[in-house]
Amino acid sequence: MLTADHPNRQRWSLAVTAFVTVVALAASACGSTSKPAGASSGGNPVNATFTYGAFTPVMVGWDPSTDYSNEIIAMNNMYETLTRYDSQTGQVKPLLATSWKKSADAKTWTFTIRQGVKFHDGKAMTAADVKASIDRTITVNQGAAYIWGAVKSIAAPNATTVVFHLKYPAPIDLISSAGYAAFIYDTKASGSTPPAKWFAQGHDAGTGPYTVAQYSKGQEIELRLKSFPGYWGGWSGAHYKNVVFRVVSTASTTAQLVRDGQITWAEQMTPQLWNSLKSDPNIVTTTATSYQNLFGMLNTSHGPLANVKVRQALAYATDYKGLVAAMGAFTPSIGIIPKGLWGYNRNLPAYQTNMAKAKALLQSAGYGPGGKAMTLNLTYTQGDQYEQTAASLLKSEYAPLNIKLNVASLAWPTQWSKAKSTNPASRQDILLFYWWPDYPDPYSWFINLFHSANPPYFNLAYYDNPTVDKQIDRVEPLSATNRPAAINLYTQIQTTLLKDSPALFLGTQTYERAMQKSVGGYVDNPAYPSVVFVYSLKPGQ
């Protein structure tokens, strides 16, 4: 089902990594510096600049059809989608489409396209451009293109109407709101140059409120965006007119730049640094539940963890409350679907720490205290402090059960390559791994992580349950026609997964943000991880 290339599922863990490794330097990294002209914490809002504090390079890619990594934070200010998901209400709202309707069988979706919209080159956007954008995304088939898997064909019968004809029912209104692979753009903007090559040169072709002003690869000020005068939303009232993406990999430096007003908004900090900013009267700190959770994927294909009793024993032996307390900025996970996303069920039979049950299960499998010793290999992403903390705690928690946990930190490409080995014996036993949805729907977790896949791609537990496969195959079409029934089916699937224990559900991340007090109107939207929709904000006077 998932055939597209996914270059970096670890994006947000790596961003945090850069921030968490140097807490001890918080008081010493840099002195006070002067505030630049147009900084958001003051000055004239007519020319106000919003400076985003990033921790890893922003523009990993430039192609709106294939982007699937850090660039989401910039792309969503240059490009727009047909719809946008409102996490506060759980509703899909109009954006480049003003309205839509579906057939009774949810296999035909008709969208009315907003008039008066221009691309950044001045060309008027029509329904034909919408069709061309999504057709190219499907044809290129990279990044998150799989989200359009239900589409059989797209028609643009006139300038303001787009019709999706589907192979099976799917929630196209929700899919159209995705932060990846759903951007509408001028597919002809590159002229005679191949689009992929043209985009890679640092060009954009969107309809969004901002367009590229300057790109400096590898520099601290990596990307500057400027307001697009022809933006359909208009520029009346107070808006940020410029957006800067500043890459600062040192935690203490970023915190100091926030204090000095040189960074408007910082995406994530250690709890220590974040708490240190709470007392500053010029800074606002916020928290928000994310849709990003941390898994311990268990190797069900080889070794001791091929035995479900051993997997269940590890699930009972894990101190979930202790884990989230030690990691900070996490809450316990109840099942797979995070709180705040439809399908979440707080009444699932989630595991609670029970060492007596863990010992009994291990002994029934021939292991445990007094039984055969067990050695397991765990890998985590190099430099990720949260994963490192989790790995250390799991090692100490499992030791009394006669389980030796060998822990290795690997660069993500190395870790992923090992996990995808076609030889089950070459894979790790436990892999620490983050996931978040490609659009605000539970389907992404289930089709990618727990549907059988050969060779493995993101099913890094190598879980293979034909009954669950059939349920996952049914649930996306059902979500478009009968959401209550889909929610019930997701509960059934999660109940089975909890029983079979192909993964440890270690926690859901909490976003801890810091921003200038002068920023008005900010609302965190976990459907778009760490994206700030700058146009919607109001700079302070």
List PLM regions with ranges.
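Bacterial lipoprotein signal-peptidase II cleavage site
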Residues: C30-A39
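Surface-exposed binding/hinge segments that line
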Residues: T112, Y146-G191, S216
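Alpha-helical secondary-structure segments
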Residues: T51, T126-S133, A159-H165, G208-P209, ...
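Ligand-site clamp/hinge motif
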Residues: G230-S276, K404
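Detector for C-terminal structural segments
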Residues: L25, T318-R346, Y386-K395, K420-Q541
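Gly/Pro-rich hinge or "lid" segments in bacterial periplasmic/extracellular proteins
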Residues: Q88-Q91, G179-A238, N242
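N-terminal lobe/hinge region of extracytoplasmic solute-binding protein
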Residues: G53-A104, D135, A205-T207
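Aromatic- and charge-enriched surface segment that lines or borders ligand/interaction sites
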Residues: T98-Q142, P157, V163-H165, D260, ...
